[in-house]
């Protein structure tokens, strides 16, 4: 993990293809905040435990905060990290000052009748060559430019996490719908989402906003994935 800056603690739960190196995305904020970015299970130096569920990932985050003697944080969940950030806020509201969801996975407004068993980067693309070979297709299909693709490399240090996101984290809010009672959330929430985001479904986000008890929804007409 990376722990940098001073001020209010911003605990970043990175998305797919991420890791502690995503601190670079927030380097201009380090003069105002203490930013902590841990690698989630299977990403950049973090092992993959037998229980790789969102709930167990939250347990690992709590252990880290206890080690750092940090009582409460602002949670910043982005992309696939949104599921874990939401789970964290539901299970440990006493440790959360506020929840920020940025171009992220969203809970369902109603329990879905079906869901995919794998929702993420196909396994054959979870390597440097595969990602490089198909790099030009990501912009029109997913809104991810070459610079973003380059920031994901090397894939071999993120592959286990990417597959776990697709097989476990990204489907958990559908598979275990009742474990995400958003209407009981006790923390203030800020959601930022672009309508033209090709990765995080704007309509799903918009439909679920009313379930958040205390939520501000920032909508951008354009900006795409991660604005």
Language-model segments: which ranges?
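Conserved HGGG/HGGXW glycine-rich cap/lid loop of the alpha/beta-hydrolase fold
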Residues: 2-45
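Conserved acidic catalytic loop of the alpha/beta-hydrolase fold
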Residues: 56-74
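Conserved hydrolase catalytic core segment
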Residues: 71-110
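Alpha/beta-hydrolase
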Residues: 119-180
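Short beta-strand/loop motif that positions the catalytic acidic residue
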Residues: 185, 191-193, 197
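Catalytic histidine-centered segment of alpha/beta-hydrolase-like enzymes
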Residues: 199, 217-227
